[in-house]
């Protein structure tokens, strides 16, 4: 069967190309993990259960934080009903996950969202970059479901 080996090779080449082209899902950054830990610390201090890190929420939050920095913007995304989102930013010289959570806890609306008992998962995004005339900012996004 003369045509078989080349057909098999072509099929194998296509499958390999698809595997190589598939985007790898990046693991959460150290800052994104620290933000989840600080959120869960705050929830524990108020007698609430820890939230698990949601992969889909994390991918969306990371992409949104990157978008906000690149677009020089600061606004909420359109999310599915039942999903909450909080944003924060600060200059690179001082802004860390603990400061983001402290800011959220000091704002009644953000505090209510962060401490909502019904949420079970959180995803975080953390992006560093030049933004709105600042040479270096850290942009934090937390999404809850």
Predicted stretch roles:
Residues 97-145:
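Disulfide-stabilized extracellular recognition modules
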Residues 1-11:
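Bacterial N-terminal signal peptides that target proteins for export
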Residues 58-97, 102, 114-116:
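Short, surface-exposed glycine/acidic/tryptophan-bearing loops
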Residues 25-30, 44-53, 85-101:
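Second-shell loop/turn segments in exported
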Residues 45-59, 72-80, 111-127:
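Surface-exposed patches in mature extracellular/periplasmic domains of secreted proteins
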Residues 21-23:
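N-terminal signal peptide c-region/cleavage motif recognized by signal peptidases
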Residues 27-70:
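A short alpha-helix/helix-coil micro-patch that ends at or immediately precedes a cysteine
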Residues 10-19:
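Bacterial N-terminal signal peptides
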């Amino acid at each position: 069967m003369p045509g078989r080996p080349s057909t098999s090779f072509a099929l194998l080449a296509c499958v390999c190309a698809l595997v190589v082209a598939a985007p790898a899902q990046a693991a959460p950054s150290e800052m994104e993990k620290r933000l989840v830990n600080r959120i869960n610390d705050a929830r524990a201090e108020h007698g609430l259960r820890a939230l698990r890190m949601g992969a889909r929420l994390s991918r969306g939050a990371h992409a949104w934080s990157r978008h906000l920095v690149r677009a020089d913007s600061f606004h909420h995304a359109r999310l599915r009903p039942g999903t909450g989102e909080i944003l924060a930013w600060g200059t690179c010289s001082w802004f860390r996950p603990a400061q983001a959570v402290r800011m959220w806890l000091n704002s009644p609306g953000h505090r209510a969202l962060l401490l909502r008992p019904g949420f079970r998962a959180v995803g975080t995004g953390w992006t560093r970059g030049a933004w709105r005339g600042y040479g270096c900012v850290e942009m934090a996004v937390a999404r809850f479901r």
